[in-house]
Amino acid sequence: MQGEEQFSCGVVIVAAGRGERAGQSAEGPKQYRTIGDRPVIAHTLDIFATWPGAGPVVVVIHPDDEELFAAARKRMAGALELTVVHGGATRQLSVLAGLEAVAATGVEYVMIHDAVRPFFDHTLLDRCGAALRDGAQALLPAIAVADTLKRTKAAGLVAETVPRTDLYAAQTPQCFRLEPILSAHRRAAASGRSDFTDDASIAEWAGIPVLLVEGAVDNFKLTLRRDLSMADEKLTRMAIPDVRTGNGYDVHQLVDGDGVTLCGVFIPHGRKLSGHSDADVALHALTDALLATCGAGDIGDHFPPSDPQWKGAPSRIFLEHAARIVRERGGTVTNADISLIAEAPKVGPHRQQMRENLAAILGISLDRCSIKATTNEKLGFVGRNEGIAAIATATVVYASRSKPDVDDRY
């Protein structure tokens, strides 16, 4: 969000519920149940902890949950300064307690979020923050209803089909200018009203215009036991590393000359490799292998042999370029393996320097770089000393994406 560094929004995390519909558990209410490897509330707090727009954070808990919350807080991935207050008999009164605590900090805006919605992200927070900065007094992230809706009567019989036009499913964080929503909550409490199911409803009752903003499909509330199971499965899938393997193959002809360059090492020899660049067949194969891990084409796409600027160029330039593309796309090179197929020259005496060159270019440790060599048993063009071939394999781990490549809801 542009100008985010000047924007500060108070946060109220509502975590005082007992979660009866999720069933009983030795771990306590659902906000303290483990999904992935940490409590639900720890996942939720971590997202606010890393959002630049987050100001003072107040967590509203049940008086009986002090120890549960303290334990959950220790499981957070990052640090977050926060204030803990006790909730009331209803969600509405718990939110009021949180708003009173936030008001004491002097912030202008507040986000009210359910602890049991751990799958929101910074994109949603940025969208909400931008709407507040643009003048909205109250805003509600929501998703258009896609399912057909039915209203029932006695005995579970369908009474009618409800038109879903202009119907939206409300989410949190629900966001407000602090003073109007605090005033509305105080008035609602004084009036004895306790039937509001969310904070936007109180804003509507108080005459505060509520703006809808686009919610997030994954930002669902963990209500039932099956929701917790689905959340755990989702986090388990997200934790699986995105490991990709790419292969590359290259061959260059041997012609009369004084030596060959392999993995950046010049080896004196009675012949040389023919090519537009320095014809380092090993680095060319590894360049293709790296590019293959992210679908970035091949070496010819990036350095066409028809381009005179690459005439005689050292092939480390090509490998550095491929490694940079991998990094820009979120990848970390974890292994590089090259097999050279040649009758001559002997690779063994130069193997260590070759490995050191690979490690330096790729920024990885020496034990992640492998160079092997074999003859072709005098078979084929390699066996006739007409050329040298190289086969390379690269292993790259890419950062997990917050959203899958395909919609897995169905």
UniProtKB/Swiss-Prot annotation:
Catalytic activity of the protein:
2-C-methyl-D-erythritol 4-phosphate + CTP + H(+) = 4-CDP-2-C-methyl-D-erythritol + diphosphate; 4-CDP-2-C-methyl-D-erythritol 2-phosphate = 2-C-methyl-D-erythritol 2,4-cyclic diphosphate + CMP
Which family does the entry's similarity section mention?
In the N-terminal section; belongs to the IspD/TarI cytidylyltransferase family. IspD subfamily. In the C-terminal section; belongs to the IspF family.
Q: What is its EC number?
A: 2.7.7.60, 4.6.1.12
- In this UniProt entry, which residues are annotated as the site Positions MEP for the nucleophilic attack? R164, K221
> This protein is called what?
Bifunctional enzyme IspD/IspF
Residue ranges for the region (2-C-methyl-D-erythritol 4-phosphate cytidylyltransferase) are 1-243
Q: Which PANTHER family match?
A: 2-C-METHYL-D-ERYTHRITOL 2,4-CYCLODIPHOSPHATE SYNTHASE, CHLOROPLASTIC (PTHR43181:SF1)
This protein's cofactor list reads: a divalent metal cation
General function of this protein: Bifunctional enzyme that catalyzes the formation of 4-diphosphocytidyl-2-C-methyl-D-erythritol from CTP and 2-C-methyl-D-erythritol 4-phosphate (MEP) (IspD), and catalyzes the conversion of 4-diphosphocytidyl-2-C-methyl-D-erythritol 2-phosphate (CDP-ME2P) to 2-C-methyl-D-erythritol 2,4-cyclodiphosphate (ME-CPP) with a corresponding release of cytidine 5-monophosphate (CMP) (IspF).
| Encoding gene, per UniProt annotation | ispDF
> Where does the chain bind 4-CDP-2-C-methyl-D-erythritol 2-phosphate?
D250, V251, H252, H276, S277, D298, I299, G300, T374, T375, N376, E377, F381, R384
Give this protein's Gene Ontology molecular function annotations: 2-C-methyl-D-erythritol 2,4-cyclodiphosphate synthase activity; 2-C-methyl-D-erythritol 4-phosphate cytidylyltransferase activity; metal ion binding
Origin organism is Rhizobium meliloti (strain 1021) (Ensifer meliloti)
Pathway the protein takes part in: Isoprenoid biosynthesis; isopentenyl diphosphate biosynthesis via DXP pathway; isopentenyl diphosphate from 1-deoxy-D-xylulose 5-phosphate: step 2/6; Isoprenoid biosynthesis; isopentenyl diphosphate biosynthesis via DXP pathway; isopentenyl diphosphate from 1-deoxy-D-xylulose 5-phosphate: step 4/6
Query: So where does a divalent metal cation get bound?
Result: D250, H252, H284
Transition state stabilizer, annotated site positions: R21, K30, H276, T375
GO terms in the biological process aspect are: isopentenyl diphosphate biosynthetic process, methylerythritol 4-phosphate pathway; terpenoid biosynthetic process
State the UniProt keywords alphabetically: Isoprene biosynthesis, Lyase, Metal-binding, Multifunctional enzyme, Nucleotidyltransferase, Transferase
InterPro entries from the UniProt entry: IspD (IPR001228), IspD/F (IPR026596), IspD/TarI (IPR034683), ISPD_synthase_CS (IPR018294), MECDP_synthase (IPR003526), MECDP_synthase_CS (IPR020555), MECDP_synthase_sf (IPR036571), Nucleotide-diphossugar_trans (IPR029044)
Membrane spanning segments where?
A: none
What residue spans carry the region label 2-C-methyl-D-erythritol 2,4-cyclodiphosphate synthase? 244-410
